[in-house]
UniProtKB/Swiss-Prot annotation:
The record marks 137 as: Lowers pKa of active site Cys. This is Octanoyltransferase. It comes from Pelagibacter ubique (strain HTCC1062). Pfam families: LplA-B_cat. The keyword Nucleotidyltransferase does not apply. Catalyzes the transfer of endogenously produced octanoic acid from octanoyl-acyl-carrier-protein onto the lipoyl domains of lipoate-dependent enzymes. Lipoyl-ACP can also act as a substrate although octanoyl-ACP is likely to be the physiological substrate. InterPro entries: aa-tRNA-synth_II/BPL/LPL, BPL_LPL_catalytic, Octanoyltransferase, Octanoyltransferase_CS. Belongs to the LipB family. Substrate binds at residues 69-76, 140-142, 153-155. Pathway: Protein modification; protein lipoylation via endogenous pathway; protein N(6)-(lipoyl)lysine from octanoyl-[acyl-carrier-protein]: step 1/2.
Amino acid sequence: MNIEIKKSIKPIKYEDAIKLLEERLLEINNGQKEDLIWILEHEEVYSAGTSYKEKEILNKDISLVKTNRGGKITYHGPGQLICYFVIDLKKRKKDIRKFITLIEETIIDSLSKFNIKTFGDPKNIGIWTDHKGKINKVAAIGVRVSKWIAYHGFAININNDLSKYKNIIPCGISDKGVINLKEIKDQDYKNLDEIIIETFSKNLEI
């Protein structure tokens, strides 16, 4: 099963990225294009998924983009690795829960290459780490499935501005924090994108 790998160097506007994903969704459904994995970085934006609530916005002055992905509200911006995808589950296993687990394993396995221990949480979607005795989210996941084609993706915090999360209740979870990789371990993460692509592609073929 062929997968197109796309990498964008310059930050991409959130709305432009979602438009491309939705166009690819239609093309895959019509048999015109192959699956897609897309690595990018966003311009600053707060995005709200289908289950967010107004009370999760602590600063009413922020600009908010509502989207049809699953999940609640989160922040995207420089220093964050975004991995979007459009994957036809009809060619694989038509099991949404297994696909979410596959995403979680992709992130966990990729970060383990940098000696960073992370884990999923059955009650709170995303990838977490225990840093100095506190549970913090290091990666957010948001997925939508249409006609058994999964799209949207996940975001890994590398060295982004964590103060931006003070304007919201990230992913609707108030009793846990948000962290980035640089705060966990100050090292070079420049090849994380390649590791993500390799691991994700391999997991999709299993």
